[in-house]
Amino acid sequence: MSRRRRASKRVISPDSKYNSVLLARFINVIMRSGERSIAEKIVYGALNKAEARLGEGAMSIFNAALNNVMPQMEVRSRRIGGVTYQVPVEVKEDRAVSLALRWIFKAAAAARKRSNKMYMDCLCNELLEAYNKRGGAYKMREEKYKMAEANKAFSHFRFN
């Protein structure tokens, strides 16, 4: 058991354009080497393109895409009697949001490597794919669900 105290959650200030904490967290995920202005340009540009394509509000598109990608279940390793089981557990809200943001970022980055498009376009495409329940990020969520479903027999080993 650790003797250190649990680290307190940092309060993230909302982004300047849409006044959203979730969008500020997404900008933080995309940001590299402290270049916040570049990350903001990429995210805002992708949201503007998505808004122009669908004709809906940028924040409603972002929130819907995020809700479609957020996982409800995942598997955690639990060692019992010398055997390690993959135990399905429910995902807490904060972790679900963090996973969804990371998955959207990773899927857009993978698409960027495959094509010659700008990252802004790849991020826009990935947000629209997640909005329509398709794409790389949604596939990652479905893989989590398949793992949880396959190991449903071990759900009685849940964590306390």
Curated annotation (Swiss-Prot):
HAMAP family: Ribosomal_uS7_B. Part of the 30S ribosomal subunit. Contacts proteins S9 and S11. GO terms for cellular component: small ribosomal subunit. Gene3D superfamilies: Ribosomal protein S7 domain. The keyword Ribonucleoprotein applies. GO terms for biological process: translation. One of the primary rRNA binding proteins, it binds directly to 16S rRNA where it nucleates assembly of the head domain of the 30S subunit. Is located at the subunit interface close to the decoding center, probably blocks exit of the E-site tRNA. Keywords: Ribonucleoprotein, Ribosomal protein, RNA-binding, rRNA-binding, tRNA-binding. Signal peptide: none annotated. This is Small ribosomal subunit protein uS7. InterPro entries: Ribosomal_uS7, Ribosomal_uS7_bac/org-type, Ribosomal_uS7_dom, Ribosomal_uS7_dom_sf. GO terms for molecular function: rRNA binding; structural constituent of ribosome; tRNA binding. Belongs to the universal ribosomal protein uS7 family.
